[in-house]
A protein has these predicted regions:
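Bacterial N-terminal signal peptides that target proteins for export
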Residues: 1-12
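Generic extreme N-terminus detector
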Residues: 5-6, 16, 288
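Bacterial N-terminal signal peptides
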Residues: 11-22
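Eukaryotic scaffold repeat domains enriched in small/polar residues
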Residues: 25-306
Length: 306
């Protein structure tokens, strides 16, 4: 039996806004620098291969890194030392955006050209497809350039349907729609390009990129509060509950605590042959090494603690 989608009404969100806490990042010059250094030439590509518009990066439980880019082998796997392992499902992708890994090491991708979200097993078999391949739309069976995907403890799936639709859709673990929220705008619960999404416990963090804020909701889409910390391109939450936010406009990565305070900043390395720091998305491994995906420089990088 189909599940009726329950859209949260804007009037409810507006009422919540009067009591919500809004955080601003002030005195940015006092943010401590994160003590990282770039690892030169970490990713060892096969002869003749190169990255193109690197949009996504993720790390699995073995320390293997997935790089999602817009070249002829869009999804590439590397081992913990940076050695190339394989490319996965070359013919499935149109325009790479985000790659994520869930608690069972399944691989999830969002594709802004194909308008789909895919779940693949660790060996690369497609287990679930959300949306309709190459068919955009604004109902619950379609996406319009989905930007990111996240999962809660129950296995429910949350999709930021951001480039074409300003909304979040929630599905159960079988891919059946449960609820959705959001519309174009700048008010609480509204979005102007929800570009990233991450979940920590019972909280859903949405990177509302063009409104230059992170909005925080409960698992049912109820607006709680927001933080204004720049333009959130990518979000990643570590096991110790720090939120890492990449901002490709400012060319930096922020480390944010649970109160919404920026407690560290990585401004990136000096420009390499004119290529500026452009962190579109990011991931952090168990050793707190940082990995970045950069669209304009066609680059993926690893940063290690000094």
């Amino acid at each position: 039996m189909s599940v009726q989608i329950q859209w949260l009404r804007l009037s409810m969100l507006a009422a919540l806004f009067t009591t919500a806490l809004v955080f601003s990042c002030r005195g940015e010059q006092s943010i401590p620098k994160l003590n990282y250094e770039a690892v030169p030439d970490f990713f060892q590509l096969p002869a003749g291969e190169h990255f193109v518009e690197v949009a996504g990066v993720a790390v699995n439980s073995k320390g293997h890194i997935y790089v999602f880019h817009r070249g002829k082998h869009p999804l590439m796997e590397f081992d913990a030392s940076g050695k190339f392992v394989r490319s996965i499902a070359d013919d499935l992708f149109v325009a790479a955006h985000t790659v994520r890994v869930d608690s069972e090491d399944n691989i999830w991708t969002t594709d802004v050209g194909a308008h789909v979200v895919l779940k693949m097993s660790p060996d690369g078999r497609v287990l679930l497809s959300l949306g309709r391949m190459r068919i955009p739309g604004d109902d619950v069976g379609h996406f319009n350039q989905p930007t990111d995907v996240a999962f809660d403890r129950e296995g429910d799936i949350y999709v930021a349907d951001g480039e074409g639709n300003s909304r979040v859709l929630k599905f159960n673990k079988f891919g059946n729609p449960v609820l959705g929220w959001g519309m174009k705008g700048s008010g609480p619960g509204q979005f102007d390009l929800p570009h990233s999404i991450a979940i920590d416990g019972d909280l859903v963090y949405v990177g509302d990129r063009e409104n230059a804020r992170i909005q925080i909701f409960d698992l049912n889409g109820r607006y709680l509060r927001e933080w204004k910390l720049g333009h959130p391109f990518g979000l990643f939450i570590t096991s110790d509950h720090f939120i890492y936010m990449s901002d490709a406009i400012a060319g930096r990565i922020l480390k944010i605590n649970q109160e919404g305070k920026a407690v560290g900043v990585l401004d990136g390395p000096p420009p390499d042959k004119g290529r500026h720091f452009d962190p579109h998305s990011l991931a952090v491994d168990k050793d707190n090494s940082l990995f970045t995906a950069e669209v304009l420089p066609w680059r993926a990088q690893k940063f290690r603690l000094k």
